[in-house]
UniProtKB/Swiss-Prot annotation:
Record flagged with keyword Transport: no
Gene3D superfamilies assigned to the protein according to its UniProt record, in alphabetical order: Vaccinia Virus protein VP39, Winged helix-like DNA-binding domain superfamily/Winged helix DNA-binding domain
Quaternary structure (record): Interacts with aflR.
Protein name: Aflatoxin cluster transcriptional coactivator aflS
Organism: Aspergillus parasiticus (strain ATCC 56775 / NRRL 5862 / SRRC 143 / SU-1)
Function: Transcription coactivator involved in regulation of the aflatoxin biosynthesis gene cluster with aflR. The ratio of the expression data between aflS:aflR plays a crucial role in the regulation of aflatoxins production. A high ratio, produced at a range between 17 and 30 degrees Celsius, corresponds with the production profile of aflatoxin G1 biosynthesis. A low ratio, produced over 30 degrees Celsius, is related to aflatoxin B1 biosynthesis.
Free-text disruption phenotype from the record: Leads to significant decrease in the transcript levels of the genes for early (aflC and aflD), middle (aflM) and later (aflP) steps in the aflatoxin biosynthetic pathway.
Protein localization: Nucleus; Endosome
Keywords: DNA-binding, Endosome, Nucleus, Transcription, Transcription regulation
Induction: Expression is positively regulated by the developmental and secondary metabolism regulator veA. Expression is repressed during Streptomyces-Aspergillus interactions.
GO CC, alphabetical: endosome; nucleus
């Protein structure tokens, strides 16, 4: 990066900061961010990261790593003793009272929370008293945040530290039982077995992956907005295999003429009970995540992953493939892609105007990606390596799978933004599918 790049970054930071300031959130955005400002926030953070990289000296890097290492340790300590839950959400209390409730020495409590004040986590509004900040309060109201922290400190950090031992013993082994995690815990069983036996670790892993992959999720939205949605008119878009309504909630305001169906995988509920549904067919527990003004355009449905697509009149069938994880290795995801294509052959054959849009995360970071996207790809890849010796998706295999089909499905074009970590394939049914269109 040159000095000219530094000036450009500074100008973009100033522009983004003014936009955020105009929104009127004087207390910051730790409690959440309006959807229309998320892109602005990403721009601000990406440019700030670039400035930090240019202006920092080697000693600054050492200090930063030392600080975050200690901050992670402090947060783990708070989590182990449930200290955050011992502090009222809206008032300050003496350190002594919190220490008594948590059952920890007051002197330790004081020393371990004060480093967190430097990042706006907790605060000391008056001498001898501690209170929640806007940031720390979220770790009480959103337990998944603390789950992610505990997974990093209890599971991932020891595994990362054991990479040298793993390499000396197993080299470049791809066997799940030869991972750095196995070295760290002294077990011969693969990490997947741990997830089956320890629901808490499985829950923590899910929380960690959801936050680490958020930049990839944002990339899906960014890439999809580059598709030609405006010409669809008053059409239906089916989000196939959705884990949540978050993607359609992000797309719906941008395309007000479209209706969306969130199609989850059908699963038998334990005890034979089905989830409570509202009048749009949406599970009541997930209804709250859909803004009131969008609920009339978003409905819910289910389908077995092996079943033929039953929705016959949609204009777009959207399939978002996640980054491989300890629970879903790359080979399984590749098989899922093949299964999804097979399930949609008939519906696309009967409606040649319909499209299937397949989005996948890039298998490796590129120089053109923004800092958040590069970090998301790298963190996801390293986590997979350390926990299972697993690898990323083989994009060559995916492209071969798409090109070699003889069932009439043809890739019409390939779309991606150079700054994010997502690629999209637009697929239609064509009789003359001797070659692909992109």
């Amino acid at each position: 990066m040159t000095l000219t790049d530094l000036e450009t970054c500074a100008e973009e930071i100033a522009t983004a900061a003014r936009t955020l300031a105009r929104d009127g959130h004087s207390g910051g955005y730790s409690a959440g961010l309006p959807d229309h400002l998320r892109a602005v926030q990403r721009t601000l953070i990406a440019n700030a990261s670039q400035v930090l990289a240019l202006a920092s000296q080697p000693a600054d890097l050492v200090r930063q790593l030392a600080l975050y290492n200690q901050l992670l340790a402090c947060l783990r300590w708070l989590g182990e003793f449930q200290v955050l839950a011992c502090i009222p959400l809206d008032e300050s209390v003496p350190f002594e009272d919190v220490a008594d409730i948590a059952g920890v020495p007051e002197c330790r409590l004081r020393r371990l929370v004060r480093p967190l004040f430097t990042i706006g986590f907790l605060c000391e509004p008056s001498p001898g008293h501690v209170a929640h900040s806007v940031l720390s309060k979220q770790f009480v109201t959103q337990p998944a945040l603390l789950d992610a922290i505990l997974f990093m400190s209890e599971t991932l950090a020891p595994s990362a530290s054991a990479m040298g031992t793993q390499t000396r013993r197993f080299g470049a082994s791809e066997q799940a039982g030869d991972s750095a995690w196995n070295m760290a815990v002294g077990s011969d069983s693969p990490f997947a077995a741990c997830l089956q036996q320890r629901p808490k670790v499985k829950r923590q892993l899910g929380a960690y992956l959801s936050y680490v992959s958020s930049a990839i999720d944002a990339g899906v939205e960014d890439t999809l907005t580059r598709m030609n949605w405006q010409n669809l008119g008053m059409a239906t878009v089916v989000h196939v295999g959705a884990q949540s309504p978050s993607l359609v909630v992000a797309l719906a305001p941008q395309f007000p003429s479209l209706r969306f169906l969130v199609q989850t995988e059908a699963k038998a509920e334990s005890g034979g009970h089905q989830p409570c549904l509202d009048n749009h067919g949406i599970p009541a527990l997930k209804l709250a995540s859909i803004p009131l003004h969008l609920r009339a355009r978003i409905t819910w449905g289910t389908r077995l992953s092996t079943a033929t697509q039953p929705v016959l009149d949609a204009a777009v069938y959207l399939i978002s493939i996640p980054f491989p994880s300890p629970q879903s290795p790359a080979m399984e995801i590749t098989m899922r892609v093949a299964q999804a294509l097979k399930a949609h052959v008939e519906v696309l054959r009967n409606n040649s105007d319909a499209r299937l849009i397949l989005t996948l995360p890039m298998s490796s970071a590129t120089r053109s990606m923004d800092a958040a996207a590069r970090a998301a790809v790298s963190l996801s890849d390293l986590s997979l390596l350390q926990l299972t010796n697993g690898g990323s998706l083989n994009m060559g295999e995916i492209r071969d799978l798409l090109r070699s089909r003889s069932d009439g499905l043809v890739v019409m074009r390939e779309v991606r933004s150079p700054t994010n970590a997502v690629i999209a394939f637009e697929i239609q049914y064509r009789v003359d599918n001797d070659d692909n269109r992109y």
